Amino acid sequence: MAKAAIIGLGRSGIAAARCLKRDGWQVTLSDRSDSPSLQATKTNLEREGIIVNLGQNLSLEASDLPNLIVVSPGVPWDAPILITAREKGIDTIGELELAWRYLQSSPWLGITGTNGKTTTTALCAAIFQKAGLNAPSCGNIGYAACELALKADKYDWIIAEISSYQIESSRDLSPKIGIWTTFTPDHLSRHQTLENYYQIKASLLQRSDRQILNGDDPYLRQIGVSQWQQAYWTSVQGKAALLGDPSRGVYLQDNWIVAFGELIAPVNLLKMVGSHNQQNLLMAVAAARLAGIEKKAITEAIATFPGVAHRLEYVCTYKGLDFINDSKATNYDAAAVGLQSVPSPAILIAGGEAKAGDDRAWIAEIKAKVATVLLIGDAAADFARRLQSAGYQDYECVETMDRAVQRAAELGPAKEAKVVLLSPACASFDQYPSFEHRGTHFRQLSLQL
């Protein structure tokens, strides 16, 4: 019996294990963590005949090696155990690649980029599904990809949000359509250099039959048609700003979306704020038209699209203050976009687990629009120093989300603020398991005011 080792007892790892077990593999799942909830999951999986090892890493010391290793997205591709596995000739892949092996008979729409992936993925799914297609979203949102394989449905399209981590471990995944939303420095602690990060992202587009790129992203625009001669480009700046052949472009003209020379819909049908969300919409429309979806379905989907949780999500209004949850803004560029999208003066809640990157545009937005910054998490002291050195004095280190929300409500009237914006510019892992948990906590606290 062929043997498979799965690393990571999360949703992706469990789905991968069940796929392989169903196909007759002997499956061992390992996770270096241990907790009562994981113990309960272990008990359930072992009833299914899946071996689960908690509190330990995979070992390749024994002579009885696995034929296949599947890694969850959070496991670094350059982890020593994975380097050793590849040196030993063991087939080593990510969960998304395993799903591709099961589901490659269906066309895939793959969306990657530093920022904008989730909203673009959600917009694509809404449009494709409004057209009556069986087109679930997976990857970073929706299902784990292997959960779709377990369903054994016939999918018209698979719409996958794909991170750089997942691309690294998915060497054969080849979408019918690939979208690249944005490119700015992020995850450099894992990928080391901007060039490495770029090449990882680019590899997915290079394997895609058709490429859609955001012409309003400065880095992608700089690379331009020299590297992506056959791409379909988008721009909210109009036809004149398009790269490449305008007849293959999607752009805004007099507040209408124009795709490949045809009027599609008024852009103001989209309820989400911000130019960046219009950019996301244009890429989704480009994908829909390339997939043959009619204008009527596109228009209806845009008009009814509710937005995405944790991405400039309106939570409530308290004493004239709008509380906005932008917890997904985990780097400086995303947080700067968040500030650009809300009215001023704003009260900003920022901080968490800091990332490497260029904070200058973000700090410039703070100086232009923010009445007070409330700093939380591990980055609070460092952010305070940076704001001070930039000549910005109106900040407070409040440490926790509870204090931040309460303090924002207190300060709002005196500062004549219009909005309280959680847009952290940081990862969440110092205080929360994920940006979703952080945003949910902010939402709960805001609604309790």
From Swiss-Prot:
It comes from the Bacteria. GO terms for molecular function: ATP binding; UDP-N-acetylmuramoylalanine-D-glutamate ligase activity. Keywords: ATP-binding, Cell cycle, Cell division, Cell shape, Cell wall biogenesis/degradation, Cytoplasm, Ligase, Nucleotide-binding, Peptidoglycan synthesis. ATP binds at G113, T114, N115, G116, K117, T118, T119. Pathway: Cell wall biogenesis; peptidoglycan biosynthesis. It is an enzyme of class 6 (ligase). Its main location: cytoplasm. Disulfide bonds: none annotated. Its EC number is 6.3.2.9. It is found in: Cytoplasm. It catalyses: UDP-N-acetyl-alpha-D-muramoyl-L-alanine + D-glutamate + ATP = UDP-N-acetyl-alpha-D-muramoyl-L-alanyl-D-glutamate + ADP + phosphate + H(+). GO terms for biological process: cell division; cell wall organization; peptidoglycan biosynthetic process; regulation of cell shape. InterPro entries: Mur-like_cat_sf (IPR036565), Mur_ligase_C (IPR004101), Mur_ligase_C_dom_sf (IPR036615), Mur_ligase_cen (IPR013221), MurD (IPR005762). Gene3D superfamilies: Mur ligase, C-terminal domain, Mur-like, catalytic domain, NAD(P)-binding Rossmann-like Domain. The keyword Ligase applies. GO terms for cellular component: cytoplasm. Cell wall formation. Catalyzes the addition of glutamate to the nucleotide precursor UDP-N-acetylmuramoyl-L-alanine (UMA). NCBIfam families: murD. Belongs to the MurCDEF family. This is UDP-N-acetylmuramoylalanine--D-glutamate ligase. It comes from Microcystis aeruginosa (strain NIES-843 / IAM M-2473).
